[in-house]
Amino acid sequence: VWALYEAEAKKEDLTVLLRWFQWAAKQWDDIAADEYVRAFPADLLELLEKVYRITGIPAMLKLARTLSASTMNWSGVLTATPIQTPVSKAVSAEELDAGLKKENGDLEGYYTRLALTTNAAALADGARAALARGWLNGSATEMNAAKTGWEKISRYHGAICGGLTANPMLAGGNPSTGIFNDTLGAWAEAFVCAGMGAHAV
């Protein structure tokens, strides 16, 4: 619906979107507590910001802040000392898969957190989430987390940490294999959102 509104600027599209938010607000605590939403909040936070900027409806800001308070701290991940070696050297694929099944999406679980914080596309989504949180709380650290994280990841794992290694995980700096398109697309989107468009080309 938002894509239609951006393309056509029709009030009817915005009305449909506002009706959805009106419905969602009634179960917002459950939505904000969902493990997937907590791990990947960027799309929803960005949508709330855009709708708020257009409509000025205070409820949009309230929903965004409630959601932001429950999400994974991606700015902390992106600005902390990064994993400097390929993740495959820290844990085998079999062990990681078994751990993920056992934890069943628990963000506090060791393997779940390891998988998220060493996944190139997830880190790109996290960069956008940090930027959105920075817009909400005015934190310069969160606003700059995408650039800081990119510089650290690039230093230890090469361009776009998987974008040039055909591996969705942090895999070191070897650029000898093909391109992982999902990762390239995710980071290009993050660069544009973070005002780092020059990195996207």
Task: Cite the ranges covered by each PLM segment.
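Glycan-recognition and catalytic cores of secretory/periplasmic carbohydrate-active enzymes
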Residues: 1-201
